[in-house]
UniProtKB/Swiss-Prot annotation, chain A:
EC number: 1.14.13.225, 1.6.3.1
Ranges where the Calponin-homology (CH) domain occurs: 507-611
CDD domains per the UniProt record, alphabetical: CH_MICAL1, LIM_Mical_like
Modified residues (Phosphoserine): 616, 777, 781
Class of the enzyme per the UniProt entry, highest EC level: oxidoreductase
Subcellular location, record wording: Cytoplasm; Cytoplasm, Cytoskeleton; Endosome membrane; Midbody
Species annotation: Mus musculus
Stated name of the protein: [F-actin]-monooxygenase MICAL1
UniProtKB/Swiss-Prot annotation, chain B:
Binding site for GTP: 17-23, 35, 39-40, 66, 121-122, 124, 151-152
Originating species: Mus musculus (Mouse)
EC number: 3.6.5.2
Regulation: Regulated by guanine nucleotide exchange factors (GEFs) which promote the exchange of bound GDP for free GTP. Regulated by GTPase activating proteins (GAPs) which increase the GTP hydrolysis activity. Inhibited by GDP dissociation inhibitors (GDIs).
Statement: the UniProt record of this protein carries the keyword Cell membrane: yes
Name this polypeptide is given: Ras-related protein Rab-15
Cysteine methyl ester found at: 212
Enzyme class, broadest EC rank: hydrolase
A Pfam short name: Ras
Gene: Rab15
Family: Belongs to the small GTPase superfamily. Rab family.
Residues spanned by motif Switch 1: 31-45
């Protein structure tokens, strides 16, 4: 080891440089180093080689080795790939710096300007495996010893910037601080080049710098001229970040991090948070880095209630503006949330200070996210070409909960540098742009799972990173408008037009719809469709349509005794329950023929779902593809209600509805009585008019989409995820649904209430083999209790039986228990617990434990484990929820527990990211839906009121309305698809929790267990198996749908 | 919606506790390996889609607890499997001996035409080896199975063995698959198939035995 008082000042400067934690210190020590070595700074790669040659210092060797290894990758051509390229990089954020480093390695001259003078962003970024590897290869561990030593992989923006800055400086990037880029200065005449407009007063040498590549990494708010930005709007989303001082005490190191909990799959956590603190969140993340970093999404209502926001303003800018936010209340809010999430184990939670010396807590809005339409452009004037590329937030604003910020940012930085290399190779502007755009298309789909596995191979070449790469996905032809020759008139991009044109051709006009309806109902006795009003009044036409699309549900003869209302009601319900087509208008309105627009909208659902299916064979048809997701969710919701109904069965009610019927409480007005025949539809929740596009049907009742929300938290409700309280008649999300009348306290959120149809259930049914959709005449199932017969009882019973089982796919015989008796299965399940009383083999193999973690830790030679390993205190179990119940047993298996925790964290992180992506898309869909509704309302008003307008105009409007309806339908479908994925995540989370709970029991001394323990252990195991079976049901559902799609 | 896969198969991993069934699965589906052992409770499954001869096969791989106390539970999942991995640990003679018992369980509970493959896992632990390669081969031959020595730790033969079993299942069901396809394209919907399977007797029965 060298003595601290080294004789060589250059060595001291190098040490200071490596250790420097402030931007100024980095720069000053680097200048000192260069001076001491007699090297001029900022001279590109040659500067690096000079420093390396001059500084013969052991401590620097390992760093040189790393940088040399990177620089020797063939793609850089020994730093000769871009020797004649001059680049200007704007912005020293992580992405700007990362791009600058790549450009320097390519041998380009790189000048970087940054308007700030220090790095002060504490916020912490999640790292993907490839970014970890990438940063390690650049010497991250050398500059920052704590790099990725925690249970989760992340780094504060500040540290990331510091280490990249150091690398950039070493590689000869010329960096100017406190200089703001304000625009481009085109070449004034032939022979001159592009320059930058900079403020304030840049050094003369910088002002006259002419460059041929501009990389803009100046953040989301700054996008160079010529680029168009697209806004992705979601529903209002308020994020809150908070940084607390990390004193690195033993207590603090023990507190487990939270890679993310999201409401959509873990309602319980948020419910208890709400109860304890009044804080209502969508999600929360906690990373332990330089600071204790928390980030969460808060609901507006609770911010208002807790006085964080002064008043409810519709403009988000104003809502979260300085004048409307109470800083002290925001601090209290963030602290309380952090305290709750960490079980108060972080002590007094003192805020870290932000750049201005104030507590580092901020509320921000991510309702809208910006995304550049294109990632690069070329401008040409007087023969001088300038290549412009975007990286970082100005290319795609990251959605923070995904933790994609730095990963996609780095990928884009690599792609931009690759583009510069291609540019330097002499590829034509259009070719370069087309390649870059092809890569840009891939960017938003990237995830750690779908990238190349071997992160060690990642390099500049896109082929090393993206599997299934097609650099010609975008053709040079398509990027012509990105090549801007200033001499021409500026060509305006026509952004939306091709889209609207497409939908025009794809939509079906009313005539086509009428024709289709005629075709579908042809031959049915007594049906003759000629219009969208009176033809449907007797209900027969609708029955005929349903019968044609789904034969076997009803024999025409059965219709004989039915009245028009009954027939129409039947058709509406069967279409919803069996075909997944939700009503748009009430049976009364259909009969009265008073709402032709509504009927058109309704029938167009059928048309778009079935138009591609041929029925010549007269066999069962299914909606071509996706509507089945809606169908599935509908079934799920109904089975959920049935479960509830069962619970309520004891409570006597004056007018008992059939059990199979989704129960509406007496409080809710009965539709048929209150609705004048032919009257326009009104929302049953707010009583206001419902325009066609706005109609949202639940159990035959119509609401505004926005009215159908949880009575407590006002969250939008989705099929499969809500319940109606029989007492007050209000709708609730499963989290807020009052539980008091449930007989059994539900330990696992909504497990019991969410009874997914499982294949296993078929074992419990004496008649499991009847595939419900195919039976012509349903066989009454003896398992169902006798109940009051109503006219459609056979159908109801049929439907009921279909709810519990997913019909087995045609590929396999229906599952049968090994000895074909459900009792046997149950008994064997019971007997399997008998063995639990005797000391069974420990769940671990001791020798495996010993070699446990060493391998997992690090292959990296300079790994310094600075953080003490989390001690084995019971507190740690808190994240593993129920494991806390028996700390004694846990301490015996430290390695087991640590690994389990680590794995759990990783899984949790994946699930969280997935959930957030879904949540975001759901919010976007909702926002788009609102826009469609507004548009549709306008059209509908025009159509209804202006009876004087010419027919031609009316027809045009009608077609437009139809188009909107179709758009809405496809959004509804996408929403349903996403909700299925949510179900999957939800189940995975439940499985994880049950698994942990069960392990808690299993590791207890068998002799210490009471009878009650054994019983609940038994119960948890059963629940676990049930959840696995439910997950399986989802897989089967997908398979079933695939099989249905096959003929198409 | 775009077609994401062509066919769905269910595979099943069985063998003594601690032979590395879960590790094999994690390595195959997530390319992850954790060396410390956490025993599986009951059953679990993971999904993966692979390409076999241009056919996108989605496989649902059921992972079972090896511990005896779960066997009544796990056996219930045998009947739905089309392919089964019988796994032992090359460093455990006992786990190898037990393969016999596992095979007899398969005979009893799994469907007739189920495809089987023998796996000797932990092939990286050469110094602790108790079961010779030839022994594995011999046993596999006896039962007419394919045999692989694998290592989840070093990623040896993982993909190969999973692909192989999938291929075997695919071959065994090729006829039915083709049949299904043609029938489907003739718009004979699966309703008929389902009904066929509901019938205890009849011409459809032949296809049933293959499909179990």
């Amino acid at each position: 080891m060298a003595s601290p008082a080294s004789t060589n000042p250059a060595h001291d400067h190098f040490e200071t440089f490596v250790q420097a934690q402030l931007c100024q210190d980095v720069l000053s020590s680097f200048q000192g180093l260069c001076r001491a070595l007699g090297v001029e700074s900022g001279g590109g790669l040659s500067q690096y080689h000079k420093i390396k040659a001059q500084l013969n210092y052991w401590s620097a060797k390992s760093l040189w080795a790393k940088l040399d290894k990177r620089a020797s990758q063939p793609v850089y051509q020994q730093g000769q790939a871009c020797t004649n390229t001059k680049c200007l990089v704007v912005g020293a954020g992580p992405c700007g710096l990362r791009a600058a480093v790549e450009l320097a390695l390519l041998g380009a001259r790189v000048v970087l300007v940054e308007k700030r003078i220090k790095f002060s962003r504490h916020n912490v970024l999640h790292l993907w495996p490839f970014t970890i590897h990438d940063l390690r290869a650049l010497g991250a561990k050398k500059f920052y010893g704590r790099f990725c030593t925690g249970t989760l992989d992340h780094i504060s923006i500040r540290q990331l910037q510091l280490l990249l800055l150091k690398v950039a400086l070493l590689l000869g990037v010329e960096i100017h601080w406190g200089v703001k880029f304000t625009g481009l200065q085109p070449p004034p005449r032939k022979g001159s080049g592009w320059r930058a407009q900079l403020q304030p007063n840049p050094p003369a040498q910088l002002a006259s710098y002419e460059f041929d590549v501009l990389i803009s990494a100046a953040g989301g708010k700054f996008v160079p001229e010529g680029f168009t930005i697209r806004e992705m709007r979601g529903k209002l989303a308020i994020g809150i970040t908070a940084n607390f001082v990390n004193g690195r005490t033993v207590e603090e190191t023990q507190v487990p991090e939270i890679s993310g909990v999201a409401r959509i799959y873990n309602q319980k956590f948020f419910q208890s948070l709400l109860k304890a603190t009044g804080i209502d969140l969508e999600n929360i993340v906690y990373y332990k880095d330089e600071t204790h970093y928390f980030v969460m999404t808060a609901k507006k209502q609770c911010l208002l209630r807790l006085g964080v926001l002064r008043q409810d303003l519709s403009e988000t800018d104003q809502l979260l503006g300085k004048a409307n936010v109470v800083p002290e209340a925001l601090q209290r809010f963030a602290r309380a949330a952090a305290d709750f999430a960490t079980h108060g184990k972080l002590g007094k939670l003192e805020f870290a200070q932000d750049a201005r010396g104030r507590p580092d807590v901020a509320a921000f809005d991510f309702t809208s996210m910006m995304r550049a339409e294109s990632s690069a452009r070329v401008q040409e004037k007087h023969g001088a070409r300038l290549l412009l590329g975007l990286v970082g937030d100005c290319l795609v604003e990251p959605f923070w909960p995904l933790g994609t910020g730095v990963a996609r940012g780095f990928l884009a930085a690599f792609d931009a540098a690759w583009m510069v290399k291609r540019w330097a190779e002499g590829a034509g502007p259009l070719e370069v742009l087309a390649e870059r755009e092809s890569l840009y298309q891939l960017l938003s789909q990237t995830s750690p799972e779908n990238m190349h596995r071997n992160v060690a191979q990642y390099g500049l070449d896109p082929a090393t990173r993206y599997p299934n790469l097609n650099l010609r996905a975008v053709t040079p032809n398509q990027v012509q408008d990105l090549y801007d020759m200033m001499d021409k008139e500026h060509a305006q991009r026509k952004s939306d037009e091709p889209d609207s044109r497409k939908t025009t051709t794809g939509s079906a006009g009313t005539e086509e719809l009428l024709h289709w309806c005629q075709e579908q109902t042809a031959g049915f006795p007594g049906v003759h469709v000629t219009d969208f009003s009176s033809s449907w009044a007797d209900g027969l036409a609708l029955c005929a349509l349903v019968h044609h699309l789904q034969p076997g549900l009803l024999e025409p003869s059965e219709l004989q005794g039915m009245g028009a209302l009954e027939a129409t009601t039947w058709a509406l319900r069967v279409a919803e329950h069996e075909l997944g087509i939700t009503p748009v208008l009430s049976a009364q309105a259909v009969m009265a023929g008073s709402d032709p627009l509504g009927l058109i909208a309704y029938l167009s659902h059928f048309h778009s779902a079935f138009k591609n299916t041929s029925h010549s064979s007269g066999l069962v048809s299914q909606p071509s593809g996706t509507p089945s997701a809606i169908l599935f969710l509908g079934k799920l919701q109904r089975s959920l209600q049935r479960t509830r109904a069962k619970v309520d069965e004891e409570t006597p009610s004056t007018e008992e509805p059939p059990v199979s019927e989704p129960s509406m409480s007496p409080n809710t007005p009965e539709l048929s009585e209150h609705q004048e025949a032919g009257a326009e539809e009104l929302c049953e929740l707010c009583g206001k008019h419902l325009y066609i596009l706005e109609r949202f049907c639940v159990d035959g009742h119509f609401f505004h989409r926005s009215c159908f929300c949880c009575h407590t938290c006002e969250a939008t409700l989705w099929p499969g995820g809500y319940g109606q309280h029989p007492g007050d008649g209000h709708f609730y999300c499963l989290q807020h649904l009052p539980q008091e009348d449930q007989k059994e306290a539900d330990n696992n959120g909504s497990l019991e209430s969410q009874e997914l149809p499982t294949p296993g259930d078929s074992n419990m049914q004496p008649d499991p083999s009847s595939p419900p959709v195919t039976r012509v005449s349903p066989v009454p199932s003896p398992s169902q209790p006798a109940r009051r017969l109503i006219r459609l009882s056979s159908l109801e019973r049929l439907r009921l039986s279909s709810l519990n089982i997913i019909p087995d796919s045609g590929a396999e015989p229906p599952p049968k228990p090994p000895r074909s008796c459900s009792d046997l299965a149950r008994e064997s399940l019971k007997s399997s617990f008998v063995g639990w009383g005797v000391p069974v083999q420990a769940p671990q193999v001791p020798e495996a434990i010993e070699k446990g973690d060493d391998e997992e830790e690090e292959e990296e030679e300079e790994e310094e484990e600075e953080e003490p390993l989390p001690p084995l205190e019971p507190e740690l179990e808190q994240t593993l929820l129920t494991l806390a119940k028996n700390p004694g047993a846990m301490t015996k298996y430290p390695t087991w527990r640590r690994t389990l925790m680590r794995r759990a964290k990783e899984e949790e992180m994946k699930r969280f990211c997935k959930a957030q992506a879904i949540q975001r898309r759901l919010n976007e869909i909702e926002a788009t839906m609102r826009e469609l509704e507004a548009e549709g309302t306008k059209l509908e008003l025009a159509l209804r009121k202006e009876s004087s307008s010419p027919e031609q105009q009316k027809k045009l409007w009608l077609d437009q309305l139809l188009r909107l309806i179709q758009k809405k339908n496809s959004l509804v479908t996408e929403e349903a698809e996403l909700m299925i994925t949510v179900q999957e995540l939800d189940l995975e989370e439940k499985q994880r929790q049950l698994d942990h709970e069960l392990r808690g029991y299993m590791n207890r001394e068998e002799t210490m267990k009471t009878e009650a323990d054994l019983q609940s252990e038994n119960q948890v195991l059963r629940k676990l198996l049930e959840v696995v079976n439910q997950r399986d049901a989802l897989i089967q559902f997908q398979e079933e749908r695939r099989l249905r799609e096959m003929p198409a | 919606m775009a077609k994401q896969y062509d066919v769905l198969f269910r595979l099943l991993l069985i063998g003594d506790s601690g032979v590395g069934k879960t590790c094999l699965l994690c390595r195959f589906t997530d390319n992850e390996f954790h060396s410390s052992h956490i025993s599986t409770i009951g059953v679990d499954f993971k999904m993966k889609t692979i390409d076999v001869d241009g056919i996108k096969v989605r496989i649902q791989i059921w992972d079972t607890a090896g511990q005896e106390r779960y066997q009544t539970i796990t056996k219930q999942y045998y009947r739905r499997a089309q392919g089964i991995f019988l796994v032992y640990d090359i460093s455990s003679e006992r786990s190898y001996q037990h393969i016999m018992k596992w095979v007899s369980d398969v005979d009893e509970y799994a469907p007739e035409g189920v495809q089987k493959i023998l796996i000797g896992n932990k092939a990286d632990e050469e110094q602790k080896r108790q079961v010779g390669r030839e022994q594995g081969q011999q046993l596999a031959k006896e039962y007419g199975m394919d045999f692989y020595e694998t290592s989840a730790c070093t990623n040896l033969n993982i993909k190969e063995s999973f692909t192989r079993l999938t291929e075997l299942v695919l071959q065994a069901h090729r006829k039915e698959l083709d049949g299904l396809r043609t029938r489907a394209s003739n718009e004979l919907a699966l309703a008929e198939l389902e009904e066929d399977e509901g019938k205890p007797e009849g011409p459809a029965n032949s296809s049933k035995t293959c499909w179990c």
